């Protein structure tokens, strides 16, 4: 397809003449069939809802087709409308547009649907089993058409993948405002999502899937590396200074979990990651994100012993069920140093977790046709997995929950994960590592995308970012010196670690000052021509301020407000009028529908004075909103960080807590008994 044909296809939106039906591509990784949850009347409603995108002359043809999709897959994806062109992040100048910011959004959307990047690209799912960009291909086509027509004085409104339309606004307003899964709280259970998604009225956007900010497995790899490195440091003794020879065991080689073997290599450990889906494991192997693949435990166990004995730095994919792996390691009495889990347990009944002793294919069939039995099998598997993990922790393994709802779903299954006082026996990685060491000080997963598509532009941004961090490190207080040292090392090595999958993007943990100064350095490089095209700034929702999630991002909030969502909602509102190009707010990212409120932004930096103003105003708020909240929760690192920010920033006045003596209160209450 020529560039002109591609641009014409974008501008056409939903074609008046229906394209030919598409064959089902068995080479692509597909979403499992969703369980049939709709009543006969609701099935009628789902098809009527889908037909709203098409003129009446096509209804007879499409109604029959959509009924078949609903029966066969549990959803209406409108496969017929899937474009014929290759889906990937093109250079920004190849997108037809009246507004360059809109072209940047188109680039980000296509990256999320690139088959090299997305988990189930033909079902418009980027990662996590159900993290969707759109619900169907009509929504994709109509959204791209609107973006091609948008001016700097319009805003596109997105309701859970549905483009509501272009509305008049102004150049400083967001170009796109995204909501995903925003439902009345009483209707936020997993089956509510199944029903509303099948009806075509809501979707689960995960974190960066439905917000157009996914950058492949790189998006989580810096955070995963930080976690593995600091978990390993907790095990250092006797003067040990590196992690070589340590064994890290986990599961998942999907969109986010696929970062684990690369993080293991960067951290210097032997990592063994189980993955039930052979296509997912093969994809990560071909992309260079895992070194070796093995589908036999009899072959894997001696290889693990050999690698640990030789202090190799190597990552291995076990293509099989994670429960089998844990049970074999426990039985063989192999010394596992670090353990975790990154199965998609936010989505346990629809492909996020596969039960032991049932094949991958049989599981996919069972979850749709026998959902109650599938649920029983999953819960039995969780109990067995936890039993094996408990045996290994009794021998000294450090196990941490990665915020994927593993401990939550294991507890619901009756697994032995509870400790004293009704608390989990294992910590969340945010409680032990990420929260007190990083989030409380404002460090989080800042990211950027070079819209030129040129590797040399990305290399320049890496150098600029490293220079900024080194300048900050020269005068930084001791309490954040270690974090800065690790982050400087990370960005210096990023190119050599071959992290790019899809768009020319980079992830870097940075605090408020670091993010702002790095973004300003990019803007200057654009203004003087050193960078050839705009840069998109963003972050994961898994950050200081963007997400209220009691089992992950806010699990180290102990004042009782961990179940509130004021921070995430305030954050997206504040970003929207301080210069974000697009903003998003979602239900359920990471831990699951009904368990989380999470949001994010995208900002197009183009070398202009307006861009510099937006950088200064928005990035300050986007980080310090969360630090202020964490400070009010009496987190010591956050109290220190927000005091430092108030000294640095004129006009910033934050309410600080007066910390009461807990023993004083307990004694007074005893007096009144």
Predicted regions: what they are:
Residues 270, 335, 398:
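Residue-level detector of anion-binding/catalytic polar loops
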Residues 149-151, 167-171, 186-187, 238-243, ...:
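Solvent-exposed alpha-helices and their adjacent loops that cap or buttress functional pockets
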Residues 315-343, 350:
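Active-site/ligand-binding-proximal alpha/beta "capping" segment
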Residues 278, 320-323, 342-347, 403-409, ...:
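Glycine-rich beta-alpha junction loops
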Residues 1-198, 202-217, 371-521, 525-538, ...:
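Long, compositionally biased, glycine/small-hydrophobic-enriched stretches that function as flexible linkers
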Residues 237-238, 258-261, 327-329, 387-389, ...:
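Generic recognition of flexible, low-complexity loop/linker segments
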Residues 535, 539-570:
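Small-residue-enriched alpha-helical segments and adjacent helix-cap loops
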Residues 205-229, 233, 244-247, 253-313, ...:
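Catalytic or ion-translocation cores adjacent to nucleophile or general acid/base/metal-coordination motifs
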